[in-house]
Design a protein with these regions (language model features):
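Start-of-helix signal in alpha-solenoid helical-repeat scaffolds, especially tetratricopeptide repeats
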Residues: 73, 258-259
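Active-site activation/catalytic loop segments of kinase-like enzymes and analogous catalytic loops
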Residues: 218-250, 261-279
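Short, surface-exposed acidic
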Residues: 21-28, 248-257
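An alpha-helical support segment within catalytic cores of ATP-dependent transferases
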Residues: 8-24, 135-189, 199-200, 290-302
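Helical subdomain adjoining the active site within ATP-dependent kinase catalytic cores
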Residues: 270-302
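Glycine-rich, phosphate-binding/catalytic loops in enzymes
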Residues: 125-126, 205, 222-224
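ATP-binding pocket architecture of kinase catalytic cores
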Residues: 29-150, 166, 181
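Active-site acidic catalytic loop and adjacent metal/ATP-binding pocket
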Residues: 33, 37-45, 55-56, 93, ...
Length: 302
């Protein structure tokens, strides 16, 4: 069996074959780029002389993500099941387990066409497709757990390399107290370009639904804007917001936008290059400066 990087454990592959049913065997496997909290492999399955592909997402046991992943697998399984029959290009669940004896936590899914695409020929069209897809997601009548912020407001402070500490302090003071959202909807919760698949400049899939929930739409918009800012610029992030507002017919609440943007911190300079993995140029030193620009613009919209 050909190998690429970390091999899935034998007992996990045995679970895959058992889940797929009689006559199925894993012929090949390849680890896919990305996956900060999990390991993702594309599996080639042989059955009755034919080959098909599926995707295996699994987590190492006893990692720092152990508590989270035991909740993430059933959550994503439930959400993907609810998405079946909708027009959102999400994977379909083949099987899932949290049983460590079977190699869990693990999630076996259908493979969607396409791959992560960070350097489009037409960025405007790229952003438009992202905004249109998010509008469609937010329009879904799908239930989910209530939104919980990733921010610990007590720990917020300007990044060590901040050149505009005043902007950070203003933003932190703004979100010091909770604010009720003006509207709520179904959220992907980690909507950004690393969780989108593209083929021939067309958005073909949205993956990683483990944090899906119900909350303010700005949570998704702001998180995507954060990721666009650190990789590209505040201008690109603002253009995404403008397209989303035009497509959805709703104005993005700047308070919730700022709250989402404040998820940026020093660790982004460490993990973002790992996520990008050479697929796009990245100015690491300029990340905080770009975030200051997008935060200042968001604050001006209040």
């Amino acid at each position: 069996m050909p190998r690429t990087d970390r091999r899935p454990p034998a007992h996990l592959l045995a679970w895959v074959e058992q889940t797929l049913g009689r006559g199925a065997s894993v012929a090949e496997w390849k680890r896919l780029t990305g996956g900060l909290t999990s390991i993702v492999h594309r599996l080639t399955i042989e059955r009755n002389g034919r080959r098909e592909e599926c995707v295996l997402r699994w987590w190492l046991p006893h990692s720092k993500w152990e508590h989270w992943m035991m909740l993430a697998v059933p959550t994503e399984t439930a959400i993907l099941t609810k998405l079946e029959g909708n027009d959102i290009p999400a994977p379909r669940v083949i099987g899932s387990t949290t049983d460590a004896l079977l190699g869990g936590p693990a999630l076996l899914m259908t493979r969607l066409p396409g791959k992560v695409h960070l350097m489009p020929r037409d960025r405007e069209r790229w952003l438009r497709q992202m905004a249109q897809m998010l509008t469609r997601i937010h329009a879904l009548a799908v239930d989910g757990k209530p939104f919980e912020s990733w921010l610990d407001r007590r720990q917020l402070s300007p990044p060590p390399d901040a050149s505009r500490a005043d902007i950070w302090k203003e933003a932190i003071a703004l979100v010091a107290e909770e604010r009720a959202p003006t509207r709520t909807c179904f959220l992907h919760r980690d909507y950004q370009h690393f969780n989108m698949l593209w083929a021939r400049e067309r958005l073909t899939g949205v993956v990683d639904w483990s944090e899906a929930c119900v909350g303010p739409p700005e949570v998704d918009v702001g998180h995507c804007r954060l990721n666009l800012t650190v990789l590209f610029s505040a201008d690109v992030a603002d253009r995404f917001r403008a397209i989303y507002e035009a497509e959805s017919g709703h104005t993005v609440d700047p308070w919730w936008d700022v709250q989402a943007l404040l998820a940026y911190g020093p660790s982004w300079k460490q993990f973002l290059p790992i996520q990008i993995d050479g697929r796009a140029p990245l100015d690491v030193d300029g990340m905080t400066g770009r975030m200051e620009e997008v935060l200042e613009r968001a604050l001006r919209r209040l």
